[in-house]
């Protein structure tokens, strides 16, 4: 079966690498253009492009996959199916109708829940107990197509974004191979999503990263782990923006929201609107991530200081 892979970040690159390892016939790759990244704003290739070049796969980087040159490339490689993972751009009807078997997206949520760009982060932020991966046939409406394959996993209470994403990548690898085998054997039976149950996971904005310590300890814990380790949950300390990582525990004791109540080797107990949360790491502006214990010993932080979650654009 002739497969074109469409994707951009590391999530997609890991899946592509595995597909090549398993001998899937990848006849072409589509990814986003190179973009400036990091403090130096150096132009870097996408992780998917890196894998494509490493494996000698034909790869294009159109501004839009719906443009003439991209459509010509797709026609030239004559795919049976397009596999899409975290591409970040909309596929138009000409692309969707081009492959013999259609276009299928690998989406890290239990659709119809968490349609959109940030399903892993939003599931963690909302304190979901389970999530999963859905492979569905793409239609014009975002993440609304009929489901071909779906698998569920439990979310651990203190699992971070990095940890959960890694597990969902591994699940996606297994599922895409299973899906392609079933597709080739005519064993795919699509089922429509229940659109009345749809929820959404919009693109993350900077204001979403700030911790509101007036909320309860569970809510604060979930906010921190949803953005751990990237891009990091935010707060203000003495007027400076800091990042928080490693939400480890919650306690029913009460204290002033945002107040750093107690610091030990395991972290800092911080007050919230209901209970306290224990957080292990804090990153000061322009510095590396350190434990609260290290910061206290370095006289950079002390008990009685207050973290605030206000955000002004």
Swiss-Prot record:
The keyword Cytoplasm does not apply. It catalyses: L-methionyl-tRNA(fMet) + (6R)-10-formyltetrahydrofolate = N-formyl-L-methionyl-tRNA(fMet) + (6S)-5,6,7,8-tetrahydrofolate + H(+). Its EC number is 2.1.2.9. PROSITE patterns: GART. (6S)-5,6,7,8-tetrahydrofolate binds at residues 109-112. InterPro entries: Fmt, Formyl_trans_C, Formyl_transf_N, Formyl_transf_N_sf, Formyl_transferase-like_C_sf, GART_AS, Met-tRNA-FMT_C, Met-tRNA-FMT_N. GO terms for molecular function: methionyl-tRNA formyltransferase activity. It comes from the Bacteria. Keywords: Protein biosynthesis, Transferase. It is an enzyme of class 2 (transferase). GO terms for cellular component: cytosol. The keyword Ubl conjugation does not apply. Belongs to the Fmt family. Attaches a formyl group to the free amino group of methionyl-tRNA(fMet). The formyl group appears to play a dual role in the initiator identity of N-formylmethionyl-tRNA by promoting its recognition by IF2 and preventing the misappropriation of this tRNA by the elongation apparatus. HAMAP family: Formyl_trans. This is Methionyl-tRNA formyltransferase. The lineage of its organism: Bacteria, Thermotogati, Thermotogota, Thermotogae, Thermotogales. The gene is fmt.
């Amino acid at each position: 079966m002739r497969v074109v892979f469409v994707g951009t970040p590391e999530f997609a690159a890991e899946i592509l690498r595995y597909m090549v390892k398993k001998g899937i016939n990848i006849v072409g790759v589509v990814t986003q253009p190179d973009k400036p990244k990091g403090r130096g704003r150096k132009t870097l290739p996408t992780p998917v492009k890196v894998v494509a070049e490493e494996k000698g796969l034909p790869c294009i980087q159109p501004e839009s996959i719906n443009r003439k040159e991209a459509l010509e490339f797709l026609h030239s490689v004559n795919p049976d199916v397009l596999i899409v993972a975290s591409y970040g751009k909309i596929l138009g009807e000409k692309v969707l109708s081009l492959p013999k078997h259609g276009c299928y997206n690998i989406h890290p949520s239990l659709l119809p829940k968490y349609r959109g760009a940030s399903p892993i982060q939003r599931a963690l932020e909302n304190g979901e107990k389970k999530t999963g991966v859905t492979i569905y046939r793409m239609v014009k409406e975002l993440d609304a197509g009929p489901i071909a394959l779906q698998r569920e996993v439990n979310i651990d209470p203190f699992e971070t974004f990095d940890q959960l994403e890694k597990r969902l990548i591994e699940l996606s690898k297994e599922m895409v191979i299973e899906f392609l085998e079933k597709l080739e054997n005519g064993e795919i039976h699509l089922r429509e999503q229940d659109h009345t149950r749809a929820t959404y996971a919009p693109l993350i904005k900077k204001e979403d990263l700030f911790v509101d310590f007036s909320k309860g300890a569970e809510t604060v814990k979930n906010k921190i782990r949803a953005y751990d380790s990237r891009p990091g949950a935010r707060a203000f300390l003495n007027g400076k923006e800091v990042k928080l990582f490693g939400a480890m525990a919650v306690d029913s004791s009460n204290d002033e929201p945002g107040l750093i109540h107690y610091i030990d080797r395991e972290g800092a107990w911080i007050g919230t609107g209901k209970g306290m949360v224990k957080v292990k790491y804090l990153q000061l502006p322009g510095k590396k991530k350190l434990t609260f214990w290290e910061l206290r010993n370095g006289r950079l932080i002390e008990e009685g200081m207050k973290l605030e979650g206000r955000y002004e654009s």
